[in-house]
């Protein structure tokens, strides 16, 4: 804990972490309590460090209350999968568990490039962790005040460069993991081992969540500006030579609190490969010591940078690491969408990217997606890759297997030629009924909204054009609406704030356009705006660039001064 924390009142989460015996708490005791389906007191928060959130089915919460029953408590688990790579045999294991042991029967791909189980009841939690462990998966530090799942560009076309970037993502993930043995002790019946220190994270762990990426330009699939720490790959002659380091991005905010805001990351400069882990460690250590531990709403790295100054933070990282940042090397992001369909890699292998709306893999009446993915995993000899856009890549397909994979995919609705560009460029967080923070619908509303936006595009004569659109149930940032050309952020049932002005590359924060409005209001606004865009845009000008150029919303250049102005 830093000197500054000794003279301020710390948030209760700091007490909880300090008293947790390195994330053990009394979780093991709670597991045996059959009176409640949930976790009590501090354990409600501590299970997050083990990759779980306690939730309940909000659709039936009221009915259960009438019957004098507690909410239908369950947990959501988020796996740790650096770079999103999963083997077919691992996929088959998670498919079976989702089918047999979860309330919803689905696998949910997320913007954190991993999968989630939703609706796991208390008696099944320990078995879930043991199953995952048996196939080489865990959920350590995918939630809580730690470094979360490390993202990496899923770029199987440039196989050698991607492999190097992925290996760095995995190394960073391992280096920044909590060292406590609490996870193995509680869930895997591991031998108890006393923990006396956390050399990187500290005994109180981090002030708030911390997110890291490794990305290969020109693809910004991982949305670097949504993350605390980013390593942007710099290559020469196809070989990775180092990274530009971007620090201080983040999208979460609180409605009505102007001291909170989304923020882009700052470019600290270039480092050669050999300094990667050292820089990762000391960006984390500076945030550990300097981050706000009294107000969790202002605890993330982005606020630390704005409070102490970017140059001061950067200099402290250099001092601790014994490394000076060189001038940033040139790079450019040009897009961030996934290349849906087949592509051939430089190694001659083929890769099929499957569009999965909102990442929800389930057997629908007309699209048995889950069965299709299972059948692919049963025959596929390469690997599978989850993308930060909630899609799934069947990677490393030999030429003689292409037809087999494609037939399975088409027969199960995993390839649908009717999917429009607008549908592919729209995304939603989970929201209702499972997320306790959701103020409005997101995933369940997205298909309907997309159809209405598609109709407006067709009305104005551009059915093949699209707008990067994201819908989220609350302002916490999971669906990355604050980097969309058009972002809808839930404010209440059926009501959203509408933000406009992001760009295709994901390098601009949008600005509030409409506040707390219903569908009739924002669809009328989109009707007018799309008409203007079609009639008045420059050649190739995207929707987000258009609304900035025309002054429909002001450009957010410096978030702390511009976002709420």
UniProtKB/Swiss-Prot annotation:
Reaction catalysed by this enzyme: hydrogen sulfide + 3 NADP(+) + 3 H2O = sulfite + 3 NADPH + 4 H(+)
Cofactor(s) the record lists: siroheme; [4Fe-4S] cluster
GO BP terms, alphabetized: cysteine biosynthetic process; hydrogen sulfide biosynthetic process; sulfate assimilation
Secretion signal span: none
Protein name: Sulfite reductase [NADPH] hemoprotein beta-component
Subunit structure: Alpha(8)-beta(8). The alpha component is a flavoprotein, the beta component is a hemoprotein.
Cofactor, how bound (note): Binds 1 siroheme per subunit.
Keywords (A to Z) from UniProt: 4Fe-4S, Amino-acid biosynthesis, Cysteine biosynthesis, Heme, Iron, Iron-sulfur, Metal-binding, NADP, Oxidoreductase
A GO term for molecular function: sulfite reductase (NADPH) activity
Disulfide bonds: none
Alphabetical list of Pfam families matching this protein: NIR_SIR, NIR_SIR_ferr
Single GO cellular component term: sulfite reductase complex (NADPH)
Domain of life assignment: Bacteria
